Amino acid sequence: MVTVVAETLTKESFEEYGTIISPDEEISRMQNLEKGANQGTAIKLLQVSQVENKSTSKVPNWNLFRCFPQPHLNRVFTQGSNQAISHSIKVLEKHPCSTQTFVPMGRTSAEVAYLVVVAKEIGNKPDLSTLRAFTCLGNQAVTYGLGTWHAPMIVLGKEEHLDFSVLIYESLDPDRPEKDCVEEHYSDGDVCIII
């Protein structure tokens, strides 16, 4: 059995697994907050996340996921509070040929909205010794690095659902689905996250 305690998502904590888009974190690091974009009505943050493609597809897809919280996760979560809620991970997946970016829609920067679970790879399988979990705010997006193992989206909070717009390159070859997604399954309780 592997158990990991979820931590707060930051650029540094996630960098081994991909990149994040975190506007408040990016803006807090800027020297010059001049609104130099859109005729002075916006701050432009450049190159906040990397997109990679090793698939045969030359055009990325925008997909939409409407995700629902599991009953035990349908409650208010706050950053930094250890509420000791246990969540079992039953599958990790990877996309061997593309990064995958999840952009949450409709939640605020004050809300813990979802949980991200990631692991590095060893021998074409998830290396559970590198497993980490992160609580994400409603205005933080994640880009899983090329081939990074991750759990499907895990929604937190009292809202009925959370929508994600998702950017990925996919071949959509019905004869070779493993080119787009590979899964590793676990029994209930084998891999647990404490939120």
From Swiss-Prot:
GO terms for biological process: allantoin catabolic process; purine nucleobase metabolic process. InterPro entries: RmlC_Cupin_sf (IPR011051), UAH_cupin (IPR047233), Ureidogly_lyase (IPR007247), Ureidoglycolate_lyase_dom_sf (IPR024060). Homodimer. Pathway: Nitrogen metabolism; (S)-allantoin degradation. It is an enzyme of class 4 (lyase). GO terms for cellular component: membrane. Disulfide bonds: none annotated. Optimum pH is 7.3. Induction: Subject to nitrogen catabolite repression. It comes from Saccharomyces cerevisiae (strain ATCC 204508 / S288c). GO terms for molecular function: ureidoglycolate hydrolase activity; ureidoglycolate lyase activity. Catalyzes the catabolism of the allantoin degradation intermediate (S)-ureidoglycolate, generating urea and glyoxylate. Involved in the utilization of allantoin as secondary nitrogen source when primary sources are limiting. Gene3D superfamilies: Ureidoglycolate hydrolase (2.60.120.480). Its EC number is 4.3.2.3. SUPFAM superfamilies: RmlC-like cupins. The lineage of its organism: Eukaryota, Fungi, Dikarya, Ascomycota, Saccharomycotina. Belongs to the ureidoglycolate lyase family. This is Ureidoglycolate lyase. Keywords: Lyase, Purine metabolism. Signal peptide: none annotated.
